[in-house]
Amino acid sequence: MAVSTVSSFLLPSFGIPSSSPSSTRLKVSLLPSSSTHGGLSSCVLTKPSVSLTKVFAVPDTLDPTPEILDEPASEVPSSSSISVDADKMAPKQKIRIKLRSYWVPLIEDSCKQILDAARNTNAKTMGPVPLPTKKRIYCVLKSPHVHKDARFHFEIRTHQRMIDILYPTAQTIDSLMQLDLPAGVDVEVKL
């Protein structure tokens, strides 16, 4: 726990002329910290001939107290404990599977088969995450020769899903290879 204190000091509110160095001498007085100031120490800078001053607040240098450093909870974690935490956060290896299909029931059935195969081998899965559907629109003239105002619009919608398999084993990869997915589903696998 860091302790911060704020000290305030008073500066003259006038410009100091550079022509007379003897008259620009400032008087500095330091007041000790007390309970009436709420733990604040103050420093007063005044010029003897002028009494106009401005107050500014400045943080003191933070010196940790010895009681804080002696506590066992304030130890710096070792590099081995940091690497163990990093291993828990991000897996070393994952399989990312992207599925594409023109028909939603086919892609949903394929996702279910992949998730069942991965979960049977005790691999952690994330997904299926629906990705944005891509629409390709084709504009075709209705008439064979003239009448350009009459047109057909055809579209092809490509539905996509993404599945991540974390911490895969050889058994997981083997069970994924044995799957018989429908021909209308495009499968892209990244290791």
From Swiss-Prot:
Gene Ontology terms for molecular function: mRNA binding; structural constituent of ribosome
SUPFAM superfamilies, alphabetized: Ribosomal protein S10
Organism domain of life: Eukaryota
Family annotation (InterPro entries): Ribosomal_uS10 (IPR001848), Ribosomal_uS10_CS (IPR018268), Ribosomal_uS10_dom (IPR027486), Ribosomal_uS10_dom_sf (IPR036838)
Gene Ontology cellular-component annotations: chloroplast; chloroplast stroma; cytosol; ribonucleoprotein complex; ribosome
Pfam families recorded: Ribosomal_S10 (PF00338)
Gene3D superfamilies: Ribosomal protein S10 domain
Subcellular location: Plastid, Chloroplast
GO BP field: translation
Major place of residence: plastid
Keywords, alphabetical: Chloroplast, Plastid, Ribonucleoprotein, Ribosomal protein, Transit peptide
Stored SMART domains: Ribosomal_S10 (SM01403)
Interval spanned by the transit peptide: 1-56
Subunit structure, as described in the record: Part of the 30S ribosomal subunit.
PANTHER family: 30S RIBOSOMAL PROTEIN S10 FAMILY MEMBER
Family: Belongs to the universal ribosomal protein uS10 family.
Name of protein: Small ribosomal subunit protein uS10c
Species this protein is from: Arabidopsis thaliana (Mouse-ear cress)
